[in-house]
From Swiss-Prot:
Annotated InterPro entries: ClpS, ClpS_core, Ribosomal_bL12_C/ClpS-like
PANTHER family hit by this protein: ATP-DEPENDENT CLP PROTEASE ADAPTER PROTEIN CLPS (PTHR33473:SF19), ATP-DEPENDENT CLP PROTEASE ADAPTER PROTEIN CLPS1, CHLOROPLASTIC (PTHR33473)
UniProt protein name: ATP-dependent Clp protease adapter protein ClpS
Subunit structure: Binds to the N-terminal domain of the chaperone ClpA.
């Protein structure tokens, strides 16, 4: 009788492990923050280059950044969001712009 209980405990533990492994990953919003110095054309370039937006959608998001102070560029897993933030910030610095890209939990 003890062996049956051991098997059920193992089966329950295995199901819990599988359930935990199948949980969707945490998601993060990547956000561009407005400043008074970065040209609008550069923001559009960033949105096209790093987020694959067409010129129309990139322009809409650039205007949201400009008038609302910030805009969400996309929602990604932690690793992808962190990479995009780092790449955008590096690109902005390389081009001598103070544009800031951040992330926050979705």
């Amino acid at each position: 009788m003890g062996k049956t209980n051991d098997w059920l405990d193992f089966e329950q533990l295995a199901e819990e492990k599988v359930r935990d492994a199948l949980k969707p990953p945490s998601m993060y919003k990547v956000i561009l923050v407005n400043d008074d110095y970065t040209p609008m054309e550069f923001v559009i370039d960033v949105l096209q280059k790093f987020f694959s937006y067409d010129v129309e959608r990139a322009t809409q998001l650039m205007l949201a950044v400009h008038y609302q102070g910030k805009a969400i560029c996309g929602v990604f897993t932690a690793e992808v969001a962190e990479t995009k933030v780092a790449m955008v910030n590096k690109y902005a610095r390389e081009n001598e712009h103070p544009l800031l890209c951040t992330l926050e939990k979705a």
